[in-house]
Amino acid sequence: SYQMLPGYFRFVCQNGCVCGQSLGEVRVPHRGDVVEKVIEGAYEVVGVFDRIEEKRDAMQSLVLPPPARQALAQAALTYRYGDEHQPVTTADILTPRRREDYGKDLWSAYQTIQENMLKGGISGRSAKGKRIHTRAIHSIDTDIKLNRALWVMAETMLESLR
């Protein structure tokens, strides 16, 4: 089937935000009038961008206290690596790579966590104590799943702290 997901890409950035289930995902099976369904789906996805911008603006206006930033980062690490061993710390994935991500707001924390999780390259330790670098995510499926999960985590944090 053909699938369209709304997303938000920062300028000069390769970590595209795939919004969670709450913001219009469109699937078109390969049967019937596929072309018409794809066109309708494209209009539906385009209509979602105003809601995405509203969420982004709300996240930018919410200053996150350090414990909330740590909780968001810990949830992301647990989602990605599980409970057993996490090769990096919350401080590692909360360290911004870009000047514009040094803010104290939810959006900056979300963008920083997302970029660090997707790009990898963060120094850490294996379960046996050996020095390692986290791996970048290259799989489309893993990328989409992680992006969705991070969006839902950020959205949940936004709703609970408003």
Label each PLM-derived region with a short phrase:
Residues 2-162:
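Intrinsically disordered, low-complexity regions enriched in serine/threonine
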